[in-house]
């Protein structure tokens, strides 16, 4: 879903459209559930209460749920010319998602680093300009570790001073 927003952003940058509706939906199928269950990635499998607790010591996986979202993206000047209220502006985007592939930790860290680097470069920002990191943070120990390592690698010693949010734990 986020890749759909990134693709829409790039299409608007390339002047392929002025307005794009982008988003996504996730519907749980038994196959999807079984994949996550068999890999031990679901919260609550150890008898504890299901909870999404990204970066928490008590985390034990994610809560599988259905959801959807849609956003409307517009070329900025087009939106301003028509008097639209601007809620946010996408300044850069980076994604290195490869679904269905299981990579070693160092490869995963590198891919997350590249996504953050691409987003910063696309926005013309330096790491010192960042005031908040919105992590994927799905509550799985392995993925949280990968993201934490990538954040440390990109932002260095200053990473401990930048708040890290985890919206996925609240909205999926």
Locate the predicted segments by residue.
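Fold-level recognition of mixed alpha/beta catalytic cores in primary-metabolism enzymes, strongest
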Residues: 24-27, 35-40
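Active-site-proximal alpha-helical scaffold in enzymes
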Residues: 1-26, 63-84, 172
């Amino acid at each position: 879903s986020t890749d759909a927003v990134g693709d829409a952003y790039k299409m608007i940058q390339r002047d392929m459209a002025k307005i794009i509706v982008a988003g996504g939906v996730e519907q749980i199928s038994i196959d999807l559930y079984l994949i996550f269950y068999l890999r031990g990635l679901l919260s609550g499998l150890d008898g504890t209460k299901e909870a999404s607790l990204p970066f928490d010591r008590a985390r034990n996986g994610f809560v599988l749920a259905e959801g959807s979202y849609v956003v409307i993206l517009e070329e900025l000047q087009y939106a301003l010319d028509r008097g639209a209220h601007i809620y946010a502006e996408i300044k850069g985007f980076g994604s290195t998602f490869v679904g269905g592939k299981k990579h070693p930790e160092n490869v995963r860290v590198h891919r997350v680093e590249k996504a953050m680097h691409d987003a910063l470069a696309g926005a013309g920002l330096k790491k010192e300009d960042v005031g908040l990191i919105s992590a994927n943070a799905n509550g799985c120990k392995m993925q949280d570790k990968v993201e934490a390592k990538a954040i440390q690698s990109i932002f260095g010693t200053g990473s401990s001073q930048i708040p890290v949010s985890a919206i996925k734990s609240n909205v999926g």
